[in-house]
Each structure stands twice: as C-alpha cells, then as structure tokens.
Amino acid sequence: KRCVAIPGDKLEIIDGLLYINNELSKLPYRAKPLFKYRVTSQNGISSKELLKLNITGFSRKFKISGINSNQQFEAIRPYISSLISSDIENFIITSGHKGIPSRIIAENRLRVTEIKEREKIISMTNSDFEKLESKKTFDSIYRIFKTTKSYNTSFFPNDIMYDWNEDNFGPIIIPQKGQEIELNKQTLP
C-alpha cells in the first residue's frame, strides 16, 4: 500500500486505472499492478508455456481418473481450488498455477490429464502482457474490468446509492484543512 493522493486531491479509478486530479497517475518504477486479461486460443492455452514466461496468475483444469479411495482424494485435496465434477470416471478440478505435484500423482497411482482450455482469465502485469502478446500464439488477449453499474457494499461508502467497484470508483475529494462541506442527504454517505 502507498499514498497516492494528498489533501485537496480528487481521486478516481476509471476502468482499473488511477486518476488524481483528472490525470492518469504515474506509478513508481517498482509498482507492478496486476490486471485481469481474457486470453483465447482455438488450439488451447498451454499452462507450461505460461509458466515458461513466468506468468503465474492463472488456474489449471485437470481430469483425474482412478480416484477410488478417500486416501487418494485427501492426497490431492490441498491442490484443489474448485471441484467441477465429482463423478469417479470424470473427476474434474481446478488448481492453482502449480497444479498437482507429480510425486502426489505417482504415489497415489492417479491418471491426471490437464484440460487445455480455449479461454483463460489471467492476472498479469503490463510487462507480462507484452511478453504474452509477443508470442503471437493466441487468438486474442484483452484486459477485462467491471463496467456494469452495480452497487457493492464492500466498497466505501458502502451505500446502495454508489455503484462503485474495484475498477470504477469515485470521484472522491481527499479532505484538506479548512475545507468546508455542507452536510445534507446528498453529501452524507
């Protein structure tokens, strides 16, 4: 976390980008904000290829055959992000970018096949995006952000009157000494 505005500034987030006093904020060179991208490929997206590029903000989908005991399930449980199908013959899970360790697969005599998805949502930095785009192996890569106006009580001022979210927020004015605000139904959050 860092200070991005000072008293008297107007702060606003538009399409995931920070604006201070109506100007796009220039982040320090060390700042590496993550954005969500939708990546598509008719040939499927290789997790191994993403990992070679040191891109890790994605999930993987696996089909697991041969699960016939609680012991096997308990062995892979720590690596499961979500369970898509619990059918013994068609057991499908998602995991983090590291997947399921080969040692766990071998010890439990599981048959694990990664499902090569045609679309992935990937969290990555601008430099990761440039690396991925330069590969020319994907049909499309585009940044996604919340554009629909729907209120979210997780975000200040936690009021249905404001349709703010993590990608579109504000504007708000950072109070400064001596500033006066008329208190009424519109100015009280």
Name each model-derived stretch.
Residues K1-P189:
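Soluble "head" domains of membrane/secretory-pathway proteins
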